[in-house]
């Protein structure tokens, strides 16, 4: 039986802490109708597989990720999708596109936009105001060491992400 799976780059504690500190300075962060995501679960989704078989997806990712290099990333800026506040991701050195393309499901047509979902909210949540307040954020840079295959389950306060597999990334010279 399949489980809900996706691949992602985890956000390291230093980058998450810097963004949390910046959010604490934002007056709009106290808006009603705002639901924060758990910073310990912050990640950059690379590929979403829906209901899938963990062993088969692990084998597929092992082949697809072999020899790929890790770019240097930074959380910077913010934006809004309908009902979602996200932190932007910039590439400081290297390239993220080859990594994202390698793990995207076959036939995926949506454009990849690297981001971290920070909060969700309804019409009174002030997401646009928060995105504006976070526009100047520039967190510390990091080079991801691994891609995670994560299982997503519904929890009482939001999704719960559990690592299924880990895939080490090569280290490119800067």
Predicted regions located by residue number:
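Histidine-dependent nucleotide/RNA phosphoesterase domain, centered on the 2H-phosphoesterase fold
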Residues: 1-174
């Amino acid at each position: 039986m399949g489980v809900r799976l996706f691949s992602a780059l985890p956000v390291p504690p230093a980058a998450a802490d810097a963004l949390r500190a910046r959010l604490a300075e934002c007056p709009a962060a106290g808006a009603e109708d705002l639901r924060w995501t758990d910073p310990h679960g912050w990640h950059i989704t690379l590929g979403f597989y829906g209901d899938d078989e963990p062993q088969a997806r692990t084998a597929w990712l092992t082949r697809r990720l072999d020899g790929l290099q890790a770019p240097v990333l930074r959380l910077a800026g913010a934006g809004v999708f309908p009902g979602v506040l996200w932190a932007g991701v910039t590439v400081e050195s290297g390239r993220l596109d080859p990594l994202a393309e390698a793990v995207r499901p076959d036939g995926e047509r949506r454009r990849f936009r690297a981001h971290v979902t920070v909060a969700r909210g309804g019409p009174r949540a002030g997401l646009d105001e928060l995105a504006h307040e976070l526009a100047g954020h520039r967190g510390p840079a990091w080079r991801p060491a691994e891609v995670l295959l994560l299982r997503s389950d519904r929890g009482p306060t939001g999704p719960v992400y559990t690592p299924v597999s880990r895939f080490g990334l090569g280290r490119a010279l800067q």
